[in-house]
Amino acid sequence: SSIFSDNQAHYYAGAIRSENSEINLLNCSLSSNRSLTSNGGGAMYLNGGIFSIKSTSFTNNQATFQGGAILISGASGSMEDSNFTGNQNTNSNGGGALLIENSSPSILRCRFIENSTSANNHGGAIKLDTTSASITDSIFIGNRSLTNSAGAIYFDSSSSPSFSNNEFRLNSAAQFGGAFFVNGSNLNLTGDLFLGNYANLGGGIATQGTMSVSLSNVRALGNEANSSSSSSAGFIYLNSGVTSSTFMNSVFSGNKSLGRYGVYRPNGPSRFVNCS
């Protein structure tokens, strides 16, 4: 186990930069590291190669440009049982804790707590770009997109990630999607919990240009669209482009909006099966 604290760089990676190599972190701590100007990765930059991150904590790291804790570009690997707390992206491109591009890692049993982006971009915890990452059994609490969208996770048409059995609690966004904002990609969720998330449009989830939405065994409890009387969709806001939305074996309770659509703002045909 190793400790990396209070390091800084003007370009990539306040603490660790790995280029086309293999890197393994086990029981490590990376805190208060900073990438000061362009490029990003407050604590780490992983460019190509292979990585394994297990039982490691990333706390209060900061990047001016993308990926408050880690910028992953073209690297393959996994993160397990690790904590990301209070990491920030402050100026551009998003991803308060992680920005993942051209890479498809697995994220298992990780915790993302109070990470944020104040950039005019997206993803208080994670921004995904050209990836089919899988995120499973992980917890997202109190992550924020302070000026734009996706309090927890953002992805667009270049990505097709998978999500199962995660918890999203008390995440928030100034604009779209307290937990998720999906721009142009399909959205498939299985067994996820959304509790007390809030935004202007879509307290839990918002989509734009998404064709297919599928939620199975999802619980949506107490999410809110609460910015103003023009807010809409306490839980899920579907904007243009949806051709199919299916909700199966799911529970919607206690969601509300200061404006319209307490639970669901539809677009296109919708199908509900065994929901309450």
Which residues does each predicted region cover?
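Right-handed parallel beta-helix
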Residues: S1-Q8, E22-R34, I50-Q62, S76-Q88, ...
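Extracellular beta-strand/beta-solenoid scaffold signature
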Residues: Q8-R17, R34-N47, Q62-I72, T90-I100, ...
